């Protein structure tokens, strides 16, 4: 399959031009023109790149790429990562905020699906765009039950509940990854915020605003989008796909 055809589809399908993002979304590193195997991962770490080589991947699609705001020098770690990609001819495609926000395969829509919820409205303003969503149960549910469901569908060791608000919740706000910035907005619009991880200061903000938070793992909540995107590309282009699981424990 032609690389440029895949890239063109991804750029349009993910609407990457609509999101101001520190990440340089799109094809970050150009490799082989012919793509037969695509690897998917959360992070373009050196270890992930080396694993992509083992799978003979022609393209690596990630949520977190290697270019954030630009490259000042090609030395050290960035040089090592680029060298492995270029020597192997692996195309690197990164999609950050557009994959969080995508209405079909996005991390946050997929996170709601774990609870059998649909996205009712955009949520979580970040750099001028909404990257999360709010879903709503027909009837309020016990907060511990929601945490239990997430622990059954994501690695249980990542799921942590911070119960500062209602014990019965109906409106659920989701922002995958580091969603602590959305706590204040959640206090006004939802009964519960589900995110990946929160900081020490985020904890105090949630405590003071009396809004409950479930942190289900930064890494774990951001595997959802790349896995969903993997299915789309496999069906559309008939390429071989592989997900490289390289958890951080965070």
From Swiss-Prot:
Entry GO MF terms: metal ion binding
Signal sequence residues: none
Family: Belongs to the GTP cyclohydrolase I type 2/NIF3 family.
Self-association state and partner proteins as the record states: Homohexamer.
Keyword Membrane part of the UniProt annotation: no
Residues where a divalent metal cation 2 binds: 64, 218, 222
Alphabetical UniProt keywords: Metal-binding
One Gene Ontology cellular component: cytoplasm
Protein name in UniProt: GTP cyclohydrolase 1 type 2 homolog
A Pfam family that the UniProt record links to this protein: DUF34_NIF3
Disulfide bridge partners, by residue number: none
């Amino acid at each position: 399959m032609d690389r440029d055809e895949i890239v063109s589809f991804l750029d349009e399908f993910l609407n990457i031009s609509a999101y101001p993002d520190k990440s340089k979304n799109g094809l970050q590193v150009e490799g082989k023109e012919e793509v037969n195997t695509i690897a998917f991962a959360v992070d373009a770490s050196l270890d992930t790149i080396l694993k992509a080589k083992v799978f003979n991947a022609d393209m690596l699609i990630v949520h977190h790429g290697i270019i954030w705001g630009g490259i000042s020098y090609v030395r050290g770690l960035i040089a090592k990562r680029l060298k492995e990609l270029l020597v192997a001819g692996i195309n690197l495609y990164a999609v950050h905020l557009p994959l969080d926000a995508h209405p079909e395969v996005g991390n946050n829509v997929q996170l709601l699906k774990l609870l059998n919820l649909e996205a009712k409205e955009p949520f979580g303003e970040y750099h001028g765009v909404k990257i999360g969503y709010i879903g709503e149960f027909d009837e309020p549910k016990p907060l511990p039950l929601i945490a239990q469901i997430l622990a059954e569908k994501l690695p249980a060791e990542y799921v942590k509940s911070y119960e500062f608000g209602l014990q019965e919740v109906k409106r659920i706000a989701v922002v995958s990854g580091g969603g602590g910035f959305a706590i204040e907005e959640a206090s006004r619009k939802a009964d519960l915020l589900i995110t990946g991880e929160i900081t020490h200061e985020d904890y105090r903000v949630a405590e003071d605003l009396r809004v409950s938070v479930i942190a289900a793992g930064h890494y774990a909540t951001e595997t959802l989008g790349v896995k969903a995107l993997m299915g789309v590309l496999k069906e559309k282009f008939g390429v071989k796909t592989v997900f490289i699981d390289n958890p951080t424990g965070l």
